[in-house]
From Swiss-Prot:
Name of this chain's protein: NAP1-related protein 2
Main location: nucleus
Entry keyword Nucleus: yes
GO molecular function: chromatin binding; histone binding
Keyword Transferase: no
UniProt record similarity statement: Belongs to the nucleosome assembly protein (NAP) family.
UniProt feature, compositional bias: Basic and acidic residues: 1-15
Reported function: Acts as a histone H2A/H2B chaperone in nucleosome assembly.
A cellular-component GO term for this protein: cytoplasm
Domain of life: Eukaryota
Domain commentary: The acidic domain is probably involved in the interaction with histones.
Gene3D superfamilies in alphabetical order: 1.20.5.1500, Nucleosome assembly protein
């Protein structure tokens, strides 16, 4: 006759075995579900890659269509005095980058050009074209960005040939109106920042992004902001002058 304790032990063993088998079935079903889910995700990734390729094809097409229009726009802009200086100074972010000396140099800025590579996903260049000026010899200052498949960005820029006595030491200029010799960074130091960068590390050239994605598509938007402010100031001055004349007439 089996002892009660032995019966209990056997029942517990059977229960443990059943639970283990059930867990194995659950684990097996979970693995199959995850594998199936991964297959679907892989399929979605393939569709997304195809979609990205199609988007790039469309972007490439319209980049080529926009190019001659941008060139016509540039021709007109060159007939407007201080257009790019005004546009930069009206931009809430770019305006912070121009020192007083930079603004003097920007008086000679004739055109800004953003040109995508033939394969738009591989990079672009930003070129600033200047008229003859007392600061540097270069007609064009260009900064080029080349994007590699591994996520790195190779940057090349014009090495500015400063005229004698005009070079900004280390890209910095002394800030006027201060007892202490405060130093502010010149916009032109942007052309000296050409280290290899990795987008995977979250490193981006914010100045280039702002010029390319914000200022370049519609610089007139920023130029008009400045023009409107000047117009409002003129109107206020004219109004004050009119009021002064009226007061004089009343006194006479």
């Amino acid at each position: 006759m089996t002892a009660p304790a032995d019966k209990g032990k056997k029942a517990k063993t059977d229960a443990d075995g059943g639970a283990a088998e059930e867990n194995e079935q659950i684990d097996g079903a979970l693995v199959l579900s995850i594998e199936k889910l991964q297959e679907i995700q892989d399929e979605l990734e393939k569709v997304n890659e195809e979609a990205s390729d199609k988007v790039l094809e469309v972007e490439q097409k319209y980049s080529e269509i926009r190019r001659p229009v941008y060139l016509r726009r540039s021709d007109v802009i060159q007939t407007i005095p201080d257009f790019w200086l005004t546009a930069f100074l009206s931009h809430p972010l770019l305006s912070e980058l121009l020192t007083e000396e930079d603004q003097k140099m920007f008086k000679y800025l004739e055109s800004v050009d953003v040109d995508d590579s033939k394969d738009v996903k591989s990079g672009y260049s930003i070129t600033l074209t200047f008229s003859e000026n007392p600061y540097f010899e270069d007609k064009e200052l260009t900064k080029t960005y080349a994007f590699a498949d591994d996520g790195t960005t190779t940057i090349n820029a014009t090495s500015i040939k400063w005229k004698e006595g005009m070079e900004i030491a280390n890209g910095n200029a002394k800030k006027k109106g201060s007892k202490r010799p405060l130093v502010e960074e010149s916009f032109f130091t942007w052309f000296t920042d050409t280290e290899h960068k990795s987008l995977a590390d979250g490193v981006q050239d914010e100045v280039a992004e702002i010029i390319k994605e914000d200022l370049w598509p519609n610089p007139l938007k920023y130029f008009n902001n400045e023009a409107e402010e000047l117009g409002e100031d003129d109107d206020e001055e004219g109004s004050d002058a009119d009021e002064g004349e009226e007061d004089e007439e009343e006194e006479n």
